Amino acid sequence: MGSGISSESKESAKRSKELEKKLQEDAERDARTVKLLLLGAGESGKSTIVKQMKIIHKNGYSEQECMEFKAVIYSNTLQSILAIVKAMTTLGIDYVNPRSAEDQRQLYAMANTLEDGGMTPQLAEVIKRLWRDPGIQACFERASEYQLNDSAAYYLNDLDRITASGYVPNEQDVLHSRVKTTGIIETQFSFKDLHFRMFDVGGQRSERKKWIHCFEGVTCIIFCAALSAYDMVLVEDEEVNRMHESLHLFNSICNHKYFSTTSIVLFLNKKDIFQEKVTKVHLSICFPEYTGPNTFEDAGNYIKNQFLDLNLKKEDKEIYSHMTCATDTQNVKFVFDAVTDIIIKENLKDCGLF
């Protein structure tokens, strides 16, 4: 009988040891898990950062996956030319080519009959001719006066390639494609011995109430703000400047009680578009008090300081900022490497090892 008790207690001890080991493994895994929250206003580049994580850390997009973006790319291209054509009327700009009025009529007719994401050779030719019209180009130059996708020029300048038969989208085409994020999208990947769980949350105002569910246990927030949005208004409220909205949102996040111990990284995104725009449109359109030179460095630093100055706990909390171009894989790779080092450093600090 004694031996029975002995074998039972051996079994119990074995089970206890296994459970301890599992708890230890779980604790180690949890310690290595980084919960990253991507926040920012609509169209600030959050979803493009997520696509880059797939390219950099998850073997990229297969040909089959790239093909799945073809309909989105065609839809983006068609929506872009339609937006420019409609703005021609609103802004009172005339076509230069006598044929363009007929092309506009055909564009509307084909757009109404075509299923979303389709592209016929006839439609491709109509779009190409319209895009070449100097009136359309003049209207495109005034894109901040109406709503136009950032990817418009990328696709419209490359119509021969993207409308050719047998076209397979490449990773750059995928990165430039735009689908409004609704709800919360999670991406998981490993890097530098850490397990990342990245959450991309819709940026439009209607999507923001869903953010609250993600707040618990967040290691780091990456806040995306589009530098190039300083002369643009919101899709959902044309009275509100996009940069002002972004600053307002950043203020509420960086000073929120939920995030008092959370690392915050600011991605000042779309630096490529900003660099081009700042030579034509003065920053004072958004910040009337700005009297500095309208250069990339000066105007960019001024915007950066507008964000960083909102941090009410400067002594205790550092906000790390980077100028980014979310469609540039090498730039994102370099910046994310730096972000990961910040996370590791902050984790060591929390453990008292730094």
From Swiss-Prot:
One GO CC annotation: plasma membrane
Compartments it resides in: Cytoplasm
Region (Disordered): 1-27
Main localization, broad class: cytoplasm
Domain of life assignment: Eukaryota
Location of region: G3 motif: 196-205
Annotated segments matching region G1 motif: 35-48
GO function terms (MF aspect): G protein-coupled receptor binding; G-protein beta/gamma-subunit complex binding; GTP binding; GTPase activity; metal ion binding
UniProt entry keywords in alphabetical sequence: Cytoplasm, GTP-binding, Lipoprotein, Magnesium, Metal-binding, Myristate, Nucleotide-binding, Transducer
Residue ranges of every copy of the G-alpha domain listed in the record: 32-354
Keyword Magnesium applies: yes
Chain segments carrying region G2 motif: 173-181
Record's compositionally biased regions (Basic and acidic residues): 8-27
Pfam families: G-alpha
Tissue and organ expression note: Expressed in taste buds (sensory organs of clustered epithelial cells) of the circumvallate and foliate papillae of the tongue at protein level. Expressed in enteroendocrine L cells of the gut. Detected also in spermatozoa.
Post-translational note: Potential N-myristoylation may anchor alpha-subunit to the inner surface of plasma membrane.
Region G4 motif, annotated ranges: 265-272
CDD domains (alphabetical): G-alpha
Keyword Phosphoprotein: no
Family of the protein in this entry: Belongs to the G-alpha family. G(i/o/t/z) subfamily.
Function (record text): Guanine nucleotide-binding protein (G protein) alpha subunit playing a prominent role in bitter and sweet taste transduction as well as in umami (monosodium glutamate, monopotassium glutamate, and inosine monophosphate) taste transduction. Transduction by this alpha subunit involves coupling of specific cell-surface receptors with a cGMP-phosphodiesterase; Activation of phosphodiesterase lowers intracellular levels of cAMP and cGMP which may open a cyclic nucleotide-suppressible cation channel leading to influx of calcium, ultimately leading to release of neurotransmitter.
Subunit structure: G proteins are composed of 3 units; alpha, beta and gamma, respectively GNAT3, GNB1 and GNG13 for Gustducin heterotrimer for bitter taste transduction. The alpha chain contains the guanine nucleotide binding site. Component of the TAS2R14-GNAT3 complex, consisting of TAS2R14, GNAT3, GNB1 and GNG2; within the complex interacts with TAS2R14; this complex plays a role in the perception of bitterness. Gustducin heterotrimer may also be composed of GNAT3, GNB3 and GNG13.
Protein name: Guanine nucleotide-binding protein G(t) subunit alpha-3
Source organism per UniProt: Homo sapiens (Human)
